[in-house]
Amino acid sequence: MAKRVYAPDCHIIVESGLMDCSPVEVPRSVGDLRFMAHCGCIWPNVRFVGFEINEYLHKANRLIAFIGGAQIDPYGNVNSTSIGDYHHPKTRFTGSGGANGIATYSNTIIMMQHEKRRFMNKIDYVTSPGWIDGPGGRERLGLPGDVGPQLVVTDKGILKFDEKTKRMYLAAYYPTSSPEDVLENTGFDLDVSKAVELEAPDPAVIKLIREEIDPGQAFIQVPTEAK
């Protein structure tokens, strides 16, 4: 959508080794053939793409990365590895893939469903480092301190991180949600005092998403009344 609506000159890089992609429809996974449409380059060392590409672009300070996960804590540390004890997990996921390298070297935008079981004060495993435990946390672990999580985008609103404390706060909520709704679905104390209501999306953009970008409704479900 970014390339179609407001950032036509952006370059999409995928952790599976694909660079400068221009998919017509939204891909279902990082290995989806849709990503190869008009793809500019296939990186040869796919196993290390998460670190090699991101380390290079970190030096150029030109990368914004997107990641997801099963759990997130107040400082933007993300778990996409397992639920429960690491050696005897209740559930094992496919992470990290390239997510650790991405979160290490990039400014990230984290996308998640907003549920109390996902927004936890302490996550079961740190797959992708955020601001660790606050100011100086990344530097203490030898991670670049000039990059880190910038936004958390959920189905209820947009959250940011305080510049001084590095702790998450609610910046904006959708017309279909409210600060109270966000708090009810968050498993830790969250500052909502700065939150503003976002405007409803442009109908033309909604039409573009439903009819051209995601016509198969892989990610965006069309309400029955809108069909």
Question: Residue locations for each model-derived region?
Answer:
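Short, Lys/Arg-enriched charge-dense amphipathic segments
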Residues: 8-15, 37-40, 75, 214-227
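Conserved phosphate- and dinucleotide-binding cores of soluble alpha/beta proteins
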Residues: 24-208
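N-terminal low-complexity or amphipathic/hydrophobic leaders
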Residues: 1-23
